[in-house]
């Protein structure tokens, strides 16, 4: 989604889907303008991940556009999802080191992804789920943190015609794959990890790829329960 997060793009491009019983769509780049320019924003200076039509806010910290769905990137993803109706959606970002379950229906998928890793691979992440009483960090709602995001729309606002909702995971890659996730990360965390990326991108990818690929394969195999 964000062009200044190249690690997420490279990991998706390098991921090989092995034989499975489910259709899988991989979209390495959802913001072509941002990817080309190495910026979070599209050519109009808007953050596409603040432009989705759920909990959209004009006064978002990041520029959200004049109205929800004003940007071609958010509309393209909306239309793609509406056509495919995926049961599971995983969006990769960089580099808060989190597995965010957007919506109560997403808790089980987040926990399956967490369980797919070994202890060392989990260290740079934290698990965040909406359902109270489960996970490392318990939250009722996270609407205020990322208004108008893909996770907000797909996890809370999107309901298919059969009344089902997709399991929506926002997977934030680690700040440092060799260290436990810090309790807090300052606003400068992305610039720091970008500098490290410029120095040794392969080292970073080699450090995170095993855990990420285990999570993605577990997610592909996971079958969400159907509400009665």
Name these PLM-found stretches.
Residues 37, 51-55, 59, 135, ...:
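A generic signature of intrinsically disordered, low-complexity regions enriched in glycine/proline
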Residues 98-102, 143-228:
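Active-site-adjacent mobile loop/cap segments within catalytic or ligand-binding domains
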Residues 56-67, 131, 183, 189-199:
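Short glycine/proline- and acidic residue-enriched helix-loop micro-motifs
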Residues 1-119:
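Active-site/substrate-binding loop(s) of hydrolase catalytic cores
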Residues 72, 78, 84, 94-170:
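Active-site-proximal helix/loop segments of hydrolytic enzymes
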Residues 84-87, 123-127, 220-228:
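Surface-exposed helix-capping loop/turn segments at secondary-structure junctions
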């Amino acid at each position: 989604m964000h062009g200044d997060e190249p690690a997420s793009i490279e990991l998706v491009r390098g991921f090989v889907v092995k034989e499975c019983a489910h259709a899988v769509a991989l979209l390495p780049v959802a913001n072509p303008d941002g990817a080309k320019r190495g910026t979070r924003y599209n050519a109009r200076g808007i953050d596409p991940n603040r432009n989705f039509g759920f909990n959209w806010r004009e006064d978002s910290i990041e520029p959200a556009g004049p109205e929800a769905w004003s940007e071609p990137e958010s509309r393209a993803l909306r239309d793609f999802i509406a056509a495919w109706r995926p049961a599971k959606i995983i969006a990769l970002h960089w580099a808060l080191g989190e597995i965010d379950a957007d919506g109560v229906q997403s808790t089980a998928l987040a926990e399956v992804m967490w369980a797919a890793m070994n202890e060392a691979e989990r260290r740079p992440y934290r698990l965040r789920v909406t359902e109270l009483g489960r996970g490392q960090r318990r939250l009722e709602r996270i609407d205020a943190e990322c208004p108008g995001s893909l996770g907000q729309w797909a996890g809370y606002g999107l309901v298919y015609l059969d009344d089902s909702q997709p399991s929506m995971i926002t997977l934030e890659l680690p700040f440092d794959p060799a260290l436990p996730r810090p309790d807090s990360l300052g606003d400068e965390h992305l610039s720091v990890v970008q500098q490290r990326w410029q120095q040794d991108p392969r080292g970073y990818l080699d450090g995170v790829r095993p855990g990420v690929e285990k999570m993605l394969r577990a997610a592909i195999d996971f079958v969400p329960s159907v509400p009665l």
